[in-house]
Swiss-Prot record:
Signal sequence interval, chain numbering: none
UniProtKB keywords: Cytoplasm, DNA-binding, Repeat, Transcription, Transcription regulation
NCBIfam families linked: division/cell wall cluster transcriptional repressor MraZ
Cited SUPFAM superfamilies: AbrB/MazE/MraZ-like
Keyword Repeat among record annotations: yes
InterPro entries: MraZ (IPR003444), MraZ_C (IPR035644), MraZ_dom (IPR020603), MraZ_N (IPR035642), MraZ_sf (IPR038619), SpoVT-AbrB_dom (IPR007159), SpoVT-AbrB_sf (IPR037914)
Keyword presence, NAD: no
Family: Belongs to the MraZ family.
The name this protein goes by in its record: Transcriptional regulator MraZ
GO CC, one annotated term: nucleoid
A GO biological process held by the record: negative regulation of DNA-templated transcription initiation
Gene name as annotated: mraZ
Domain SpoVT-AbrB, first and last residues per copy: 5-47, 76-119
Length: 143
């Protein structure tokens, strides 16, 4: 399970060091794609395959389903690590996530998210203010 929060920097060549704990869980190749709230999501290949299967079951007749599928699949890239444990973030993904030098990598269960530090701080501040209400709304999920 991917968990934790890590602060890293994106270098001038758009390379990002991934925490060693996450590299060990990802394997040799993995998928990075556009995600919600101007973030990116990295899936181990086996988790991506499961997710992609679910995407392929979305009804083509539903406009929102088509939009979600297009957005995620068009932004997806297969990636691997260099010898220093870095990945290259392509321009299209970098722009989507509004990444600059300061980046936050957050564990998210079956994968991890990549955020600009500014966006992450704004998101977590809002979530912290509403956390009790969010938790209450999730009682139906038996957490």
């Amino acid at each position: 399970m991917f968990m934790g929060e890590y602060q890293h920097t994106l270098d001038d060549k758009s390379r990002l060091i991934i925490p060693a704990k996450f590299r060990n869980q990802l394997g040799d190749t993995f998928v990075v794609t556009r995600w919600m709230e101007h973030s990116l999501f990295a899936f181990p290949k086996d988790e991506w395959d499961k997710f992609e299967e679910k995407l392929n079951k979305l009804p083509f007749g539903a406009k929102d389903a088509r939009a979600f599928r297009r957005f995620v699949l068009a932004g997806a890239i297969e990636s691997d690590f260099d010898k220093q444990g870095r990945i290259i973030i392509p321009t299209v993904l970098k722009e989507h996530a509004q990444l600059n030098k300061n980046v936050v990598i957050t564990g998210s269960g079956n994968g991890f998210e990549i955020w600009s530090k500014d966006n992450w701080e704004e998101y977590t501040a809002g979530t912290a203010e509403n956390f009790d209400q969010i938790a209450e709304e999730l009682t139906d999920f038996d957490l």
